[in-house]
């Protein structure tokens, strides 16, 4: 019995020595938004932090207001800062202070008007935006009357599509989807009889593996075309341009993270995902119909060679 007790004591000591120690008793706060890759990625990174001994809580947050929340320390980090959708909010928070640009993903992003390839059969001048406008009547619905219907992203993504339509004099009406899932449902419904459709889309995600398509080519985005009427092809208008065609995808963090959770902060600095990896995260939820937490664990299990070095 004495030998057994000694053995148990030794095992317990080894387990205690091997267990990761929390940087703080307070939880790291991870944000949850309304598109699949971000939700899965938050859980992937959160589980990595948990493997380091830290506690993580997940909170649903507005995808624009989150930068103010991170700046104030109410949310600890943001794993998907898309240049096109959230660059302005991110820059504004950086100027105020309290938030850091921690890392840049390998992924290159694009966010803009997009159509599945069957739409090009109905409007062969695509992807030129003027050709799209000439075909506006083919996208009209009872909801939009004689104007073409563009299905935009959720309102909180702040894509300024209505401003773009007005600036470029397009015969389109913007209708905002309630969620990313509503956009995929629109495409699935249109595919059945090859109805021409133009929607907001972005890369990386899983969609082009299911529905091959193209982005609409608007006047090229240049710095200031969204804020300065003098920049861009229409002299007195802002948003007379597309979104960045090669946008960044960054990671932001509360500046107090490095002192409060130094182990996880060091790991976060090393985190970087490719377009293919992010698309896979979205696919696990949107195609394979996994719960985001399960998708995150599946991704971690299949990709230890990718993320383990981030914790070393």
Question: What are the roles of these predicted feature ranges?
Answer:
Residues 21-29, 49-50, 140-147, 305-312:
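Immediate post-signal peptide segment of exported/extracytoplasmic ligand-binding proteins
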Residues 207-267:
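C-terminal lobe and pocket-closing loops
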Residues 23-37, 54-59, 147-151, 268:
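Short, well-ordered beta-strand elements
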Residues 98-150:
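A conserved helix-loop-strand patch within extracytoplasmic ligand-binding domains
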Residues 26-28, 37, 157-173, 177-194, ...:
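An extracytoplasmic/periplasmic, membrane-proximal ligand-sensing/linker region
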Residues 42, 59-97, 186-188, 206-211:
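Pocket-flanking alpha-helical
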Residues 111-122, 247-260, 283-284:
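A bilobed periplasmic-binding-protein/Venus flytrap-type ligand-binding module shared by bacterial periplasmic
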Residues 75-79, 149-227:
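Ligand-binding pocket segment of bilobal, Venus flytrap-like solute-binding proteins
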């Amino acid at each position: 019995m004495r030998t057994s007790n000694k053995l148990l004591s030794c095992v317990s000591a080894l387990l205690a020595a091997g267990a990761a120690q929390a940087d703080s008793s307070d939880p790291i706060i991870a944000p949850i938004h309304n598109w699949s890759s971000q939700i899965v990625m938050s859980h992937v990174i959160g589980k990595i932090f948990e493997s380091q001994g830290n506690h993580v809580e997940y909170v649903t947050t507005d995808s624009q207001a989150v930068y103010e929340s991170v700046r104030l320390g109410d949310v600890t980090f943001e794993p998907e800062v898309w240049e096109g959708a959230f660059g302005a909010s991110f820059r504004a928070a950086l100027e105020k202070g309290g938030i850091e640009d921690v890392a840049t993903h390998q992924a290159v992003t694009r966010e803009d008007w997009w159509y599945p390839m069957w739409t090009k059969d109905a409007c062969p001048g695509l992807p030129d935006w003027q050709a799209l406008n000439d075909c506006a009547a083919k996208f009209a619905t009872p909801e939009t009357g004689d104007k073409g219907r563009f299905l935009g992203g959720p309102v909180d993504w702040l894509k300024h599509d209505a401003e773009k339509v007005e600036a470029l004099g397009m015969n389109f009406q913007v209708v905002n989807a309630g969620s990313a899932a509503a956009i995929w449902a629109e495409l699935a419904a249109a595919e059945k009889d090859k109805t021409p459709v133009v929607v907001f889309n972005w890369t990386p995600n899983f969609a082009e593996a299911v529905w091959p398509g193209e982005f609409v080519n608007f006047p090229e985005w240049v710095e200031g075309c969204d804020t300065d009427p003098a920049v861009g092809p229409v002299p007195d208008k802002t948003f007379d341009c597309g979104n960045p065609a090669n946008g960044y995808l960054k990671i932001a963090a509360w500046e107090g993270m490095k002192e409060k959770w130094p182990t996880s902060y060091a790991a976060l600095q090393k985190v970087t995902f490719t377009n293919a990896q992010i698309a896979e995260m979205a696919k696990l939820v949107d195609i394979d119909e996994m719960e985001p937490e399960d998708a995150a664990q599946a991704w971690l299990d299949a990709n230890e060679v990718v993320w383990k070095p981030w914790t070393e």
